[in-house]
């Protein structure tokens, strides 16, 4: 079993020194991935292609799937190699292989040749094509748009009959560009933007800002692991988790409602910049698209970038949501993205679309930056290969109820702005207001003889916070499944 791997065209037009370096890196990447599945796979670099050989025919489908997902490969040919003596012998070998395939079809023959021979490529095409036409009565020659193109590569005394042509994903081999840090949330945008930088030749590390609970974190880790395993498993990468509950709580308490979105993003790029500096990473990657949400205006994006000490890359800046979702389906992250939560109470209800620097700086003046520093210092660093083991751990389940019992208290965990606008009213049960960002520090001070039913508008943050509390030993928590109307 043999494959001829063709490099991405942009690689081939580079200078000889750069082309050789890129081809060498791609060869190493292919070897790293394929030999995990088949130790006997041979990967050999040639001037304008890479040769992949394997004796294990049963691994064919797996090898094809792996090659199709390695950045830097434009396409690859599955070929059958045979020695020949003369042009007529090539025809006989070709006839034996394609006779059944050409029955009732139109066809043409295309030959590429290297080495010294008594015939040219065009002469070989005419001779072989004419012979096939004579010996297969139901087949007809058609040089333009045929049903079947018979492709033959001739090199010295060997011929390679191309059985199948497989498309690759193109791009540059991972390692030809510098490392980047992707801010991954588990949604459609961040997954696709991560993939786009991988395809462009960067090793992508992942940074996740956790707003509470294991369920969301596990979902995001699964997405990052999926992207890494499918498209960049040739390289080791890191997954960094930063607990941002305290930061969000500080913003909700001290920052003007309209400025919260921009301030939160500025805090995220500040934290990510510190992580990037630690690992000598030059750029951070976000999934923002111009105008997609209110915070993603040019004015706001410029102010967000001012808080970063690293280059901020936005590969999706001109993409429509439809395009992004279509790409997520192609790379296999759409199902995970659909299950990711939208947090209630995190982003302001009336965000500014044209933030003013002076106003942002004034609001940040109220912020205790020691909380941000503490979040970064306590970040968790994980080799992404460990995620597969970690996600197999049992996730604690939380009961959701719609009818309240006698010993139960409603715990409204929405932000103060939301509770003021739409208070939870219960004529039969006590209601305690405790914003979600205070639960970790204040829940333990409540009467633990009571059962607490957590409530938020969409039911997402309440579930995540209930999971967090259960993980920390509190068994007296449930989630209220009934929305306020």
From Swiss-Prot:
Residues 404-483 form the Rhodanese domain. It is an enzyme of class 2 (transferase). Residues 61-165 form the THUMP domain. It is found in: Cytoplasm. Keywords: ATP-binding, Cytoplasm, Disulfide bond, Nucleotide-binding, Redox-active center, RNA-binding, Thiamine biosynthesis, Transferase, tRNA-binding. GO terms for cellular component: cytosol. Pathway: Cofactor biosynthesis; thiamine diphosphate biosynthesis. GO terms for biological process: thiamine biosynthetic process; thiamine diphosphate biosynthetic process; thiazole biosynthetic process; tRNA 4-thiouridine biosynthesis. Disulfide bonds join 344-456. Its EC number is 2.8.1.4. ATP binds at residues 183-184, 265, 287, 296. GO terms for molecular function: ATP binding; CCA tRNA nucleotidyltransferase activity; tRNA binding; tRNA-uracil-4 sulfurtransferase activity. Pfam families: ThiI, ThiI_fer, THUMP. SUPFAM superfamilies: Adenine nucleotide alpha hydrolases-like (SSF52402), Rhodanese/Cell cycle control phosphatase (SSF52821), THUMP domain-like (SSF143437). Catalyzes the ATP-dependent transfer of a sulfur to tRNA to produce 4-thiouridine in position 8 of tRNAs, which functions as a near-UV photosensor. Also catalyzes the transfer of sulfur to the sulfur carrier protein ThiS, forming ThiS-thiocarboxylate. This is a step in the synthesis of thiazole, in the thiamine biosynthesis pathway. The sulfur is donated as persulfide by IscS. Belongs to the ThiI family. PANTHER family: TRNA SULFURTRANSFERASE (PTHR43209:SF1). This is tRNA sulfurtransferase. It comes from Haemophilus influenzae (strain 86-028NP).
């Amino acid at each position: 079993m043999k494959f001829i791997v063709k490099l991405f065209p942009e690689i081939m037009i580079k200078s000889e020194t750069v082309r050789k370096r890129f081809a060498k890196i791609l060869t190493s990447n292919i070897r790293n991935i394929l030999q995990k599945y088949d130790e006997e796979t041979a990967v050999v670099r040639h001037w304008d292609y890479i040769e992949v050989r394997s004796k294990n025919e049963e691994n064919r489908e797996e090898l094809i799937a792996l090659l199709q997902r390695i950045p830097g490969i434009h396409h690859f040919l599955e070929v059958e190699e045979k020695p020949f003596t003369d042009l007529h012998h090539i025809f006989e070998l070709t006839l034996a292989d394609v006779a059944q395939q050409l029955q009732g079809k139109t066809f043409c023959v295309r030959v590429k040749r290297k080495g010294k021979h008594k015939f040219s490529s065009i002469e070989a095409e005419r001779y072989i094509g004419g012979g096939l036409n004579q010996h297969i009565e139901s087949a007809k020659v058609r040089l333009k748009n045929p049903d079947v193109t018979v492709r033959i590569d001739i090199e010295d005394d060997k011929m390679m009959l191309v059985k199948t042509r497989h498309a690759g994903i193109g791009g540059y081999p991972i390692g030809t560009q510098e490392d980047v840090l992707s801010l991954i949330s588990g949604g459609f945008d961040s997954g696709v933007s991560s993939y786009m930088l991988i395809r462009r030749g960067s090793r992508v590390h992942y940074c996740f800002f956790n707003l509470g609970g294991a369920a969301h974190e596990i979902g995001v880790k699964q997405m990052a692991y999926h992207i890494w395993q499918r498209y960049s498993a040739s390289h080791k990468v890191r997954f960094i988790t930063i607990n941002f509950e305290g930061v969000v709580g500080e913003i909700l308490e001290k920052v003007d409602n309209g400025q919260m979105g921009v301030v939160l993003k500025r805090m995220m790029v500040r934290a990510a910049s510190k992580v990037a500096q630690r690992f000598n990473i030059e750029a951070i990657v976000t999934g923002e698209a111009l105008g997609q949400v209110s915070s993603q205006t040019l004015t706001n994006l410029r102010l967000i970038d001012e808080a970063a000490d690293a280059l901020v890359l936005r590969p999706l800046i001109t993409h429509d949501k439809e395009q992004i979702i279509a790409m997520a389906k192609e790379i296999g992250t759409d199902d995970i993205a659909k299950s990711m939560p939208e947090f209630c109470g995190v982003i302001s209800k009336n965000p500014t679309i044209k933030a003013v620097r002076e106003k942002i700086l004034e609001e940040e003046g109220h912020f205790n930056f020691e909380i941000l520093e503490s979040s970064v210092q306590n970040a968790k660093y994980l080799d992404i290969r460990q995620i597969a083991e970690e996600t197999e751990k049992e996730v604690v389940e939380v009961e959701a109820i719609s009818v309240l019992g006698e010993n139960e208290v409603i715990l409204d965990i929405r932000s103060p702005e939301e509770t003021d606008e739409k208070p939870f009213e219960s004529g039969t049960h006590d209601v305690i207001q405790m914003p979600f960002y205070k639960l970790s520090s204040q829940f333990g001070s409540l009467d633990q003889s009571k059962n607490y039913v957590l409530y938020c508008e969409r039911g997402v943050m309440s579930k995540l916070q209930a999971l967090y509390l259960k993980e920390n030993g509190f068994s007296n928590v449930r989630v209220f499944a009934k929305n306020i109307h």
